[in-house]
């Protein structure tokens, strides 16, 4: 009777660690979902990142100070630049710190920083259509003048709501800043006044909405915070971990499953982590305690838990079977 028992034991143990295909398979994740390295030697101060919905697996970035108003399309598979876009119709950029994509594949670029320590009475946002063909080209942009309701601010974080197209800015303040809300639609005539709404307790260097607009993440140099959008009644949910260093950029992958966090410098890495909470375009991700929490219920955590539970059940079954065979 030993051979049947051994066969049954093997079958039970195999079954214990078997998981559904949906749990073991990541599916067709967008390129860049595991992170990548920006290899273009022209990109040494990547200060913003935006995942393209028009070209899945492509990520738009820019330097905070460059030789001109340039955007770079980076392939998330190779880390190579596949297109450089020059903006026409705008003045000389001062300190370009952020980029986001709104409805209709409209790219918004935030020239909102103060790299030179100057308190500007106004800053600029540029809007342009995302090119349908990825090649080096010049695209005409619209330039918007931006002012803050409570005076000049230094800022590096700009968000564009993926459903409404409304633009938000978070000022950079060591003691924490605020989320500033822009007009429902930006105007190219006159100043667009941004008003403070909820406080953001972080020295923010970038921020991004999830693809469904249900949450947004704010990152700094030493940590991050994520918020539930909650239909505009914003709720702070918890902290997220970030890679240490000159961290300047953040975006969600287009499937809403990963949060990508980038750095400045030559050959700058972009690291991926599960989205916090259960927001994002396709749900999933870790719990509210943060992206890298050891107790998170990301896809890997679920798989391990399923296997562990199965192992316990299998061992219990084996003990029962052994007793049964002994009786025979």
Q: Which stretches of residues belong to each language-model region?
A:
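Sequence/structural signature of beta-propeller domains
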Residues: 2-15, 20-328
């Amino acid at each position: 009777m030993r051979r049947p028992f051994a066969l049954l034991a093997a079958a039970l143990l195999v079954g214990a660690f078997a998981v559904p295909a949906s749990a073991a398979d990541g599916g067709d994740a967008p390129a860049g979902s595991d992170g990548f390295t920006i290899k273009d030697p022209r990109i040494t101060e990547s200060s913003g990142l935006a995942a393209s919905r028009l070209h899945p697996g492509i990520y738009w970035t820019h330097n905070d100070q460059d030789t001109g108003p340039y955007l770079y399309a980076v392939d998330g598979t190779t880390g190579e630049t596949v297109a450089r876009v020059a903006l026409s119709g705008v003045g000389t950029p001062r300190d370009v710190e952020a980029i986001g994509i709104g409805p209709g594949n409209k790219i918004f670029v935030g020239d909102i920083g103060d790299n030179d320590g100057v308190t500007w009475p106004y800053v600029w946002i540029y809007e342009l259509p995302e090119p349908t063909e990825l090649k080096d080209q010049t695209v005409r942009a619209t330039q918007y003048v931006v002012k803050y309701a409570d005076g000049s601010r230094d800022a590096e974080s700009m968000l564009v709501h993926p459903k409404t197209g409304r633009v938000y800015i978070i000022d950079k303040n060591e003691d924490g800043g605020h989320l500033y809300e822009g007009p429902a639609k930006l105007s190219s005539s006159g100043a667009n006044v941004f008003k403070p709404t909820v406080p953001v307790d972080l020295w923010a260097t970038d921020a991004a909405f999830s693809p469904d607009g249900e949450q947004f993440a704010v990152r700094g140099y030493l940590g991050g915070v994520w918020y539930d959008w909650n239909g505009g009644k914003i709720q702070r949910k918890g902290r997220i971990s970030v890679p240490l260093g000159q961290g300047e950029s953040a975006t969600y992958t287009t499937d809403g499953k990963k949060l990508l966090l980038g750095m400045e410098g030559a050959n700058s890495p972009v690291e991926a982590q599960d989205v916090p909470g259960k927001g994002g375009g396709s749900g999933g991700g870790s719990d509210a305690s943060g992206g890298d929490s050891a107790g998170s219920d990301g896809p890997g955590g679920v798989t391990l838990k399923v296997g562990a539970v199965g192992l316990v059940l299998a061992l219990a079954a084996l003990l029962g079977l052994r007793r049964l065979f002994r009786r025979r």
